Each structure stands twice: as structure tokens, then as C-alpha cells.
Swiss-Prot record:
Residues 289-715 are annotated as: Disordered. The modification Omega-N-methylarginine is found at R617, R697. The modification Phosphotyrosine is found at Y91. In neural stem cells, rapidly degraded through the proteasome pathway following growth factors withdrawal, a strategy used to induce differentiation. Residues 104-154 form the DHHC domain. Residues 1-13, 74-148, 213-715 are cytoplasmic. The modification Phosphoserine is found at residues 247, 296, 299, 345, 380, 398, 406, 409, 415, 425, 429, 432, 529, 554, 621, 684, 694. GO terms for biological process: innate immune response; lipid transport; positive regulation of NLRP3 inflammasome complex assembly; positive regulation of pattern recognition receptor signaling pathway; positive regulation of protein localization to phagocytic vesicle; positive regulation of protein localization to plasma membrane; positive regulation of pyroptotic inflammatory response; protein localization to plasma membrane. This is Palmitoyltransferase ZDHHC5.
Length: 715
């Protein structure tokens, strides 16, 4: 009955309960009206009192069984096993007093029914300790109303028996008046009572047995414990006392309450604001993001203050004014992306003004790599930074100085500590610049083109600003010397010189232009060589003459191992020589100073006796007690003949060693395997180590170097 509110009205389900109530009340009323007055006079006045009490007890239990909540479980709003991805199993097993009891999944109420609970098909609810659905009371009989139903049956049976018995007694007292009205009504009531006594008495007896055994009608009918032990029984007396004397079970459904309407008078009346007056835009996080005022300013001050106090929604982009560190990284990333992907890159100084201080000068802040041939060279060349200014400040992109403090020029800035184990990553073009004595502009161009610092800061710079790509090795532009050198006209490269880090296309173009000039004929008329030795002292020229004498006297060695001094003889063999294993050395690598940064157009003049162009040793003149690092070639390349993997060498005629102005012009040979010069001999040989040479032909001395490198020296 209580569960029927809110559902569709079904008149048919009220027919049984209405008939039962009519028969009960009607028969009892007739009994009291026609039979009880005669019995009170003939038998006892207590007979009507007894029947009245019994009738009230029956009526009370009937009402309680009809209108009381049987113990309905509320339906689950969501599945209990919603965290499971699979469908809930039909049964779950629990153990009660050592006996396994199954709990069935209720698809309607969406939970597992507790033990002794069942879903009523008429009420469409799960009822705790479901017994049966009684149509005569129009309600399910469960844990909460079973007591009243059982008492109703007992009292009704007793009442029927009382009505039938006292009616029969009245008929026997008035057997002569069977045709009378009172006797006829009494006989009719007896027929009704007798008619209902058989089913009611049978039902009462059945429930008495169930209560004594501790079972329900559902368990008895379905035969759940027919062949086993009932875990819910506590004995006959305990079972009866539990049904009749136990406290009522709690109610699981809340009682429906009517909504109370309270009228508030003007002192407590809030101003009504319609949707047309205020437009509120709710963000995803519930914050009021936009208000449009159409009324007065004061009506929205409270709302605005509340929205201002609340935490604002996360912006699509970070607040650069609040997060300084994040602003720095975002500025760097944005500028780098625009400089790499855009056709016309922005000036690099604007990108690096927020960079953390690896270097104190802005001249060292340039892009570490490039994705095209353009890069941002045009912007970087516009910087009015001189070479001398850039040399005063330490730069984490500059080449680490390998010269001791005593041989260091005061104009040079401080460099990083040299690690001999990481010297394999030094650029070979820097050694070429020091070995051949080019003009300062070309030296700095070579240096900026091929310099890769071994310092961890340089590596951190490359990995922080971009990946260490192959293009960044081919055309680097991160050196401040590059900017200063490119500001002036670029001089022609020396004959036979090829940068090891040029692209393949540019190398082929330069090589095609260079081949006609590499003939072993006399030197053509040309501009003064960029390699000038105007300031050479006399004793250096004398040492060159001594070397010529030794070259004439010493026989060539056929299978000699690679000269240790070759590592410092000019330019290293291959760009990949840095990947070859290198040994720590204490040779001229530790004594060589960085490139002198003199103005363009002036020859590089060394401060000490030996010029930079001749400071490297020759093939046969390593310093005693020193060992230079290995090159990227194996010992098998040290024979006179070039190996099969290497192309034929280009022979370049050396200029006369002595000129009227003591000018020494050197031309080195280059291998086509990598386009780099092998070695340039410039120092006197050490004792016990004869140089590599070949027989003289027609006034020209042919000297064989390691790996198939040959020299022709005019005598």
C-alpha cells in the first residue's frame, strides 16, 4: 500500500482487500446487531464483550498488515558493481553459521539481494525476509509486517470460530423461531463465517508451522532448505518469540514529506532578478566569467566580489608577468621556432637577452644550429661588436685554449679548462689555420665554421636550444667570430683548401673550380699569397734549410707507422676523426695558443719566436718525450701507397722555400676521400726519426707522407 503512491492506479488489486474488509466488518456488524443481544440475556453479558475485543484485534492487525511497510529496500541509483567492466554475476555466496547461502543479483533494483530477501513481482520491490504477497491485505508480507499478519490470522481464526460458535448457540436457544428475522440473520452470518473458516484456519495452521520452524512461505514453497539445514532457525520457542516479541525492524524508506510553502513578507523579501536583466556565463569550472548589467550597479556588486574572490580559471597561455622562469623558456622557444621555421629569421640578440648566464656577452649568443642555408646570418652580421670586444669576454662557444698561461696573449679572453680525453672533438680546421698561417680573416672564418667546443656548456647550449643536427655541423653560425668576419669582404680561399664541414654540394663546386689550379707546373702570376712570412726571423729560415738537407740525405721508409706528430701537423684527416680513439698527449696541443684576433688584412704575427703558421711539427719531427693523439686512420694507411679505399692524391707543387723577401709559401696535398690537407712540415726533425721521402726527379724533391700524402719541393 505505501509503495503504491505515485504509480498508476489499478482498481483490480483493491477488489480482494475490499471484499475481505466488507465480509469482516459486515458479518461482525450483523452478529453484534442480531445475535449478541440475545446471547447477553440467555448466556452471559461477557459474550458481546469478548467478540468486540476480538473483532477490534482482528481489525487492528488487518490494518497494520495492510498499511505497514513490509521492509522494502530502496533501489540503487547506480549499479553496485559499476567499477567492474564486466557484467555482474547472477549469484554471490555468503556464509551464515557455516552454511553457504547464495545472494542473487536483482536486475530491477540493481543490487545483490540479502539473504531471505526476494523481489515481489506485484509490488516490484525487494522485500527483506519476503514471505509472500497477500492479495487480501493488498501488501507484501515481509519482516516488518509479518508479525501483524500472523496475529491477524490467529485473531481472525479465533474471531470466526467465536462468531460461528456463538451464532450456533443462539440458534439452539431459539429453535422454535427459525422463521424469525434474528434467527435467519444469525444463520446467514454463520454460513459466511463457516465459509471463511476453512481457508483462514488452514492458512493460520500453515504459518504456525513456519514460525515454529523458522521459515518463510517463500523458503518453504521454493524448497530452499528442504534437503538441508536452515541456518536461520533458532529453535521453536526462539522462533516464536522472535516473531511475536522482537523489536520491529527499521524502516529503509523515508516517509514522504510535503513541501512546505512559507510566505515571506517585504522585510525579508529578496529582489527578484530575471534572466533578461543579468546574463551570466558559466565557465567549465563553475566560475562566473562574464556579467552583463542591465539594472543598477549596486545589484551586481556582491556577485562580482564573489567571482573575484574565487580562483580564476586556468588561462590558455601562462601568465608571463607572474612566472618569470616560464616566460624565459617560452620566449626562447618561441623565438627559436620563428627563426628556424620562418624564411626571414629575427635578430638573434633579441632571443638571447633572457638566456641564463652561460656567457656574459651577447656576441656569443647566436643560434647553435641551422635548418637552411639562410639561417639568420644577415641579422647577426649587423651587430656592431668587434673582435676585440668578443675576445675579452669568455664564451661557452669559443674554442678552449690549449696554450699555457705563459704563452697566452693578454688580448685573449679566458678559456675553458682543456680536457685531453675529450680533445677528439676539436675541429680540424682550427689546426689547419694554426698550421698554415692564413690571414686572420680566413683563420676566424675557419674557426667559426668548424669549431665544436668540448666544454659541457657548449654541449648544453646545443641540446638546450635544439638538437645537435648534421646541419649545425655543416654550417654553424654560433661563433661570434663568424659575425665579425662576415662583416667584411670574404677573401678567396687558399689553393687546395676545402672546409671539412661544408655541404657536399658546395664541396663539389669548389673542387671543380680548384682542379685546374692544381697542376704541378710553375706557379702562375697571382696576387700575393694569403700565407705570408714577411716577419719570419732568420733562424726559422735556417731551420727550413736544415730540413731540406735532411730530406735529401734520409732514405724513404716504406712501412712506417703513423707519425705521432702528424696529429699536430696542420689539418686532421677526416671530419670523423673525432670519433676515433684518441690518447691523452702532452704535445703541442697543450702549447698552442688560440687564434690571434688582429684586425683584418694584417698577417698573424706570433708573439714568440715561432709563428703560428710554423708552430706545428712535420712528419718526421715530433718533440722528444711527447705523444700526439691518433688520427682517424688506422696503421694500415701508413704505407707509401694510398689504400684502395682512398682515391689518388693530388700533388701540389710547393713554392720555393726561400724568396728574396724570405717568404715561404707552402702548398699541401689533399685527399679526395675527405677534402682535407694531411700535414705540413715546418719544424726540424728529431734525432733518430728519419722523415718520409721519395727520390728526387729533375730538381723537384718528392716527399711521401702517411696515408698516401705526397709533397713536391722545388730545390
Amino acid at each position: 500500500m505505501p509503495a503504491e503512491s505515485g504509480k498508476r492506479f489499478k482498481p483490480s488489486k483493491y477488489v480482494p482487500v475490499s471484499a475481505a474488509a466488507i465480509f469482516l466488518v459486515g458479518a461482525t456488524t450483523l452478529f453484534f446487531a442480531f445475535t449478541c443481544p440475545g446471547l447477553s440475556l440467555n448466556v452471559s453479558p461477557a459474550v458481546p464483550i469478548y467478540n468486540a475485543i476480538m473483532f477490534l484485534f482482528v481489525l487492528a492487525n488487518f490494518s497494520m498488515a495492510t498499511f505497514m511497510d513490509p521492509g522494502i529496500f530502496p533501489r540503487a541509483e547506480e549499479d553496485e558493481d559499476k567499477e567492474d567492466d564486466f557484467r555482474a554475476p547472477l549469484y554471490k555466496t555468503v556464509e551464515i553459521k557455516g552454511i553457504q547461502v547464495r545472494m542473487k543479483w536483482c536486475a530491477t533494483c540493481r543490487f545483490y539481494r540479502p539473504p531471505r530477501c526476494s523481489h515481489c513481482s506485484v509490488c516490484d520491490n525487494c522485500v527483506e525476509e519476503f514471505d509472500h504477497h497477500c492479495p487480501w491485505v493488498n501488501n507484501c508480507i515481509g519482516r516488518r509486517n509479518y508479525r501483524y499478519f500472523f496475529l491477524f490470522l490467529l485473531s481472525l481464526t479465533a474471531h470466526i470460530m467465536g462468531v460461528f460458535g456463538f451464532g450456533l448457540l443462539y440458534v439452539l436457544y431459539h429453535i422454535e423461531e427459525l422463521s424469525g428475522v434474528r434467527t435467519a440473520v444469525t444463520m446467514a452470518v454463520m454460513c459466511v463465517a463457516g465459509l471463511f473458516f476453512i481457508p483462514v484456519a488452514g492458512l493460520t495452521g500453515f504459518h504456525v508451522v513456519l514460525v515454529a520452524r523458522g521459515r518463510t512461505t517463500n523458503e518453504q514453497v521454493t524448497g530452499k532448505f528442504r534437503g538441508g539445514v536452515n541456518p536461520f532457525t533458532n529453535g521453536c520457542c526462539n522462533n516464536v518469540s522472535r516473531v511475536l516479541c522482537s523489536s520491529p525492524a527499521p524502516r529503509y524508506l523515508g516517509r514522504p514529506k510535503k513541501e512546505k510553502t512559507i510566505v515571506i513578507r517585504p522585510p525579508f523579501l529578496r529582489p527578484e532578478v530575471s534572466d533578461g536583466q543579468i546574463t551570466v556565463k558559466i565557465m567549465d569550472n563553475g566560475i562566473q566569467g562574464e556579467l552583463r548589467r542591465t539594472k543598477s550597479k549596486g545589484s551586481l556588486e556582491i556577485t562580482e566580489s564573489q567571482s573575484a574572490d574565487a580562483e580564476p580559471p586556468p588561462p590558455p597561455k601562462p601568465d608571463l608577468s607572474r612566472y618569470t622562469g616560464l616566460r624565459t623558456h617560452l620566449s626562447l622557444a618561441t623565438n627559436e621556432d620563428s627563426s628556424l621555421l620562418g624564411k626571414d629569421s629575427p635578430p638573434t640578440p633579441t632571443m638571447y637577452k633572457y638566456r641564463p648566464g652561460y656567457s656574459s656577452s651577447s656576441t656569443s649568443a647566436a643560434m647553435p644550429h641551422s635548418s637552411s642555408a639562410k639561417l639568420s646570418r644577415g641579422d647577426s652580421l649587423k651587430e656592431p661588436t668587434s673582435i676585440a670586444d668578443s675576445s675579452r669576454h669568455p664564451s661557452y662557444r669559443s674554442e678552449p685554449s690549449l696554450e699555457p698561461e705563459s704563452f697566452r696573449s693578454p688580448t685573449f679572453g679566458k678559456s675553458f679548462h682543456f680536457d685531453p680525453l675529450s680533445s677528439g672533438s676539436r675541429s680540424s680546421s682550427l689546426k689547419s689555420a694554426q698550421g698554415t698561417g692564413f690571414e686572420l680573416g680566413q683563420l676566424q672564418s675557419i674557426r667559426s665554421e668548424g669549431t665544436t667546443s668540448t666544454s659541457y656548456k657548449s654541449l648544453a647550449n646545443q641540446t638546450r636550444n635544439g638538437s645537435l643536427s648534421y646541419d649545425s655541423l655543416l654550417t654553424p653560425s654560433d661563433s661570434p667570430d663568424f659575425e665579425s668576419v662576415q662583416a667584411g669582404p670574404e677573401p678567396d680561399p687558399p689553393l687546395g683548401y676545402t672546409s671539412p664541414f661544408l655541404s657536399a654540394r658546395l664541396a663539389q663546386q669548389r673542387e671543380a673550380e680548384r682542379h685546374p689550379r692544381l697542376l704541378p707546373t710553375g706557379p702562375p702570376h697571382r696576387e700575393p699569397s694569403p700565407v705570408r712570412y714577411d716577419n719570419l726571423s732568420r733562424h726559422i729560415v735556417a731551420s727550413l734549410q736544415e730540413r731540406e738537407k735532411l730530406l735529401r740525405q734520409s732514405p724513404p721508409l716504406a712501412g712506417r707507422e703513423e707519425e705521432p706528430g702528424l696529429g699536430d701537423s696542420g689539418i686532421q684527416s677526416t671530419p670523423g676523426s673525432g670519433h676515433a680513439p684518441r690518447t691523452s698527449s702532452s704535445s703541442d696541443d697543450s702549447k698552442r695558443s688560440p687564434l690571434s684576433k688582429t684586425p683584418l688584412g694584417r698577417p698573424a704575427v706570433p708573439r714568440f719566436g715561432k709563428p703560428d703558421g710554423l708552430r706545428s711539427r712535420g712528419l718526421g719531427s715530433p718533440e722528444p718525450g711527447t705523444t700526439a693523439p691518433y688520427l682517424g686512420r688506422s696503421i694500415s694507411y701508413s704505407s707509401q701507397k694510398a689504400p684502395s679505399g682512398v682515391s689518388e692524391t693530388e700533388e701540389v707543387a710547393l713554392q720555393p722555400l726561400l724568396t728574396p723577401k724570405d717568404e715561404v709559401q707552402l702548398k699541401t696535398t689533399y685527399s679526395k676521400s675527405n677534402g682535407q690537407p694531411k700535414s705540413i712540415g715546418s719544424a726540424s726533425p728529431g734525432p733518430g726519426q728519419p722523415p718520409l721521402s721519395s727520390p728526387t726527379r729533375g730538381g723537384v724533391k718528392k716527399v711521401s707522407g702517411v696515408g698516401g700524402t705526397t709533397y713536391e719541393i722545388s730545390v
